[in-house]
Every structure is written in structure tokens, then in C-alpha cells.
Amino acid sequence: MTDIPVARLRNFCIIAHIDHGKSTLADRLLQETGTVSSRDMQEQFLDNMDLERERGITIKLQAARMNYCASDGEQYVLNLIDTPGHVDFSYEVSRSLQACEGALLVVDASQGVEAQTLANVYLALENDLEIIPVLNKVDLPGADSERIKQEIESIIGLDTSTAIECSAKTGIGIPEILQSVVDRIPPPKDLLNDPTKALIFDSYYDSYRGVIVYFRVMTGSISRRDKILLMASRKSYELDEIGIMSPDQRKVEDLHAGEVGYLSASIKAVADARVGDTITLVDDSASEPLPGYTEAKPMVFCGLFPTDADQYPDLREALDKLQLSDAALKYEPETSSAMGFGFRCGFLGLLHMEIVQERLEREYDLDLIVTAPSVIYQVNMIGGETLLIDNPATLPDPQKRESIEEPYVRIEIYAPNEYNGTLMGLCQDRRGDFVDMKFITTDRVTLIYEIPLAEVVTDFFDHMKSRTKGYASMEYHLIGYRENDLVRLDVLINAERADPLTTIVHREKAYGVGRGLVEKLKELIPKQQFKIPLQASIGSRIIASESISALRKDVLAKCYGGDISRKKKLLKKQAKGKKRMKSMGKVDVPQEAFMAVLKLNQ
């Protein structure tokens, strides 16, 4: 494909908040340039997982190459790199931005600028991208283009005099967008003669060909007969094929600086071809990789257990396969007295966790029990060593540790003014430290807080949405660890510690959480033939307790009248049996009980 000069290449991506119409806009661009015929077109063409279409979110990055005849009569090649909009996947966004020279900033003309839009715009500005503002959904009755333009100018500082108004649904403004991509986004630098470097911005697992890597050639060129070297993992591979996505894969002989394509080289696992890694040639390798590569670090952990113990090998196989296509997923085997064998898994965030869980249940037909999510705590021991704890049940005893530090995030919430008070209340309930409050426009405000990540991962998002009728949006990033007075709260069911219910909480909140937990468990655990005590404890001190009364069979039903000693004998016999059951009986804890821990509004 080297017949197109670099000057006529354009690489761009679309930045938007969830639901602002990014995937629909991508569909229209593909249709307008004739890349996909109207017959093959389907909604959200670039979102190919069912789950993505169903939730209406983009999870994996996609790319498409379009040929476009501009107003000057020349043929241009436009590479669209689709990005996920969700905060959990911000690392993937930053990598795809590095592969572009420009971005379309899509803002919903009825809703205005939202949190994730801003987070991604700042990433784009860091990468020196040319940003073209686009107002989408102008056909809606509630659209107010002028107000939104002012909002973009005051919040982001972009000149919106040339902003394009469009409606991806009806096709208004699509030709103007394509023309402005050609006119305003700069072509890639012409670095054909430098040593080859290519940036991996996505990879996925194909069960026939192994890992398919999507990359952008930054300098030099790659041809089908080359032997490649991945610089982070130091592994080399023979190429099987390289090609372009238009949007179906088409083989080509070579790709040069500025072009975007895919390659397959019988790579076994996605972890070998990490997003952000640099591809170079074995024979003429680059001296240093492209900047910015980091390994995805999991922030949220939870236990996954099969409801049926026989499914444990299937769960292991399913996780192995998922990890081939999801390099950010980490897991290790774990056993628990209450739940049997399972895995402790690490995720980028709550959405990532839900998606993995849903894919396991849907694609691999597993029934899972998921324990409450937790974060990584840093425990400073008395001997001076530091432990990282991701499972609350493994927290060392108080006499062995000096202090516990927990991760903090800086959270920015964008919302209409009238919800200011209720949001500040929510952040204070969650142990947040107030940092700043900015009025963006006369009726919108940004609140900035520093909050422990553990308070954000459970149900902060749901509460924020319900308190603001869905109008608020948020964005957060990790800022480091801070020491706090944290304790381990254990739950004892029938005097046995239930590991999956163990949580780490702030000492001030321990009583409330413990009280709430045992009350909730009392509602959810079915009665047994014997009395079940439920207790919440910190170390050996019980701070809250409830008990589930026994189901009682009426053993006196068949005694009509008669002597009292007969009745006493039967009651004594029953009491003896109950005592034996209590010492031997096991209590089955239903899945709802574990989920109750999540729902306990901290």
C-alpha cells in the first residue's frame, strides 16, 4: 500500500463520553466513504462483541481505513482509530491517541461536556493532537448548540467558531467532518528512512491465527517477509501476514511510516504483545522503544468461585482463554472455607470486573459467586517490611503491623449546580477531602475531591447518579497511598469466620458496617433446625451480633394430656439433638448474602 504518499494520510480518533454517539458517527463515516456498503451495514459496526452492542459501550479498540476523495480531487487515506470512552480503559485510550495526529471531539448538543470527555481531551492535548470539535445530535429537540459551544470554550479552551454541527443518526454534517479531517489534521511525519518502530495500540486473540496485533508504523516500514522483535517482552517472531483494516482485514505486502495495519505472527497470548509495546525489526532494530509503555495494573480485586465445585477446572480454562485476549486481567487460585476452590482476580475497575464476569457466564456457561470487591492495601509491618494485601482475609494481625495505607484517588465530578450540596454530602460520607470547586458555566460545577479508592469501588457511582437524577458524571485517577486508621472486620456465622465477607473498614465506620452486615445476613440466610449466631468482630472483640432462631418441630403434638414427665423427656431429647446438630451442622450461605455486602451503603 505504499503508493499513497505520506502527505495524503490522516490518522484520527474520536473522543466522546459514553452515549454521545461515537460509534454511530463512526458508522456514518464508514458509509459516507463507501468503506462499508449499505447492505453490510449494521448498527455500531466497529463494536463486534455482543456485549459491547448490548451495553452500548466500546470495550476493545477498533480501527478502520477509509479512502476519501477530497474537494481538491485528490484521494486521501483516512485511518479511524475507535477508542473506548470508559474511565476503566483510559490506558488503552492514551495508547490509541499516541497513534493519531488528530481527534474529533464529539459532544452531545443536548448534554454538553462530560467528565470522561474532558479526561480524554487532556490526554489528547498532552499528545499534541489537533482537535476538531463536533456537536452531535443537533436534530434533537433539546439541542442547544450555542450554549454547548460556549461550554467547550470555557472548559477546554478550544476555539469553537469552526465547530461542526452534525447528526450521526440522520447523516447531517458528515461530509463536512470528512473534509475538515483532511484540511485540519496534519499528515504523519515522513520518517521512512529511520529504523522501524511501530506502536501496538490493540491486540486480540483469534483461535485460528493466534494474536492479531493492530499497530501504527511510526518510523521506517514493515514488510511481510520481515522478522519482528517486540521490545518490552524481547520476543521475536516470523510474520505470517500483514494487512490493513477496511474494516475487514485485507492482506498487503508492506506498510510504511504513518500507516495503520494489523499483523499476525503466531503469537500465543495477548500478554506477549502488550498494548503500548514497540515493534521493531530483528535485523535493523531501533535503539530505544517508543515512550509511554506501562503495564496495566489492576486496581480492584474480588474472588470468583463456581457455585458447583465440579466447574472449577472449567473456570480455570475460561480465565486462561479470557486472559489471552485481555492482558489487564490478573488471577491466582484461592481457597475459602465457606466457598471451596476459586480464583482471586484483579481488574482495572468496576466496569471491567462486571464485563469479565458477564463474559465468563455468557461465553463459557459458568455459574459464579463473586465476593465483594476490594483494593490493594499497603501494610507496614513492625519488622520494617511492607506487604501488599489485595484480599482482606489475609490482613496480618494488629500486633504484627505498624500501620495500613490505602490508595486514594482524585475524583472530579461534573454536575448541574443544584446538586452541589447533595454531592458534597456524598463525598464527605465517603471520607473525601475537599480540594476545589469550580463553576464552569453559570449552571454547571466541577467538584474535586480526594477519596479512598475503597469508597469509590463499591457503589459510589450508583449513588452519585441517583442523587443527581443521572446528570452528574465523574472521572478519577490514582494519586498514591495514605495512612489511615483501618481495621479488619470479620463476620462469624455459627462461630466460623466467613472469609468472603471479611472487609477492611475505617475504625469510625466499623460499628455501623458490622451492625448493617449482621442485620442483612439475618434476613438473607434461611433458618436451620438450630439457632445460628451471627457476629461481626474486630480481632477478638465482638462489635455486633444477631441470631437466626431455629425452626422448631412440635414434638409434643402427639401427646394429648398425660403426664408432664413424658413431655419433658421429649423436649429434652429434642434439645439434645439440636445441640448435636449445632456442633456438627454447616450453614449454607446464599449468593445474595455476599452481594449484600456490596449493597451496604458504606
Swiss-Prot record:
Residues that coordinate or bind GTP: D19, H20, G21, K22, S23, T24, N136, K137, V138, D139
Subcellular location: Cell inner membrane
Membrane topology: Peripheral membrane protein
Main localization category: membrane
GO biological process: positive regulation of translation; translation
Cellular component, GO annotation: plasma membrane
Listed EC numbers: 3.6.5.n1
Record InterPro entries: EF-4, EFG_III/V, EFG_V-like, EFTu-like_2, G_TR_CS, GUFP, LepA_C_sf, LepA_CTD
Record keyword DNA-binding present: no
Domain tr-type G: 7-189
Domain of life from the UniProt record: Bacteria
Catalytic activity: GTP + H2O = GDP + phosphate + H(+)
UniProt cross-references to PANTHER family, sorted A to Z: TRANSLATION FACTOR GUF1 HOMOLOG, CHLOROPLASTIC (PTHR43512:SF4), TRANSLATION FACTOR GUF1-RELATED (PTHR43512)
Annotated family: Belongs to the TRAFAC class translation factor GTPase superfamily. Classic translation factor GTPase family. LepA subfamily.
Role of this protein: Required for accurate and efficient protein synthesis under certain stress conditions. May act as a fidelity factor of the translation reaction, by catalyzing a one-codon backward translocation of tRNAs on improperly translocated ribosomes. Back-translocation proceeds from a post-translocation (POST) complex to a pre-translocation (PRE) complex, thus giving elongation factor G a second chance to translocate the tRNAs correctly. Binds to ribosomes in a GTP-dependent manner.
Protein name per Swiss-Prot or TrEMBL: Elongation factor 4
Organism: Prochlorococcus marinus (strain SARG / CCMP1375 / SS120)
Protein's gene: lepA
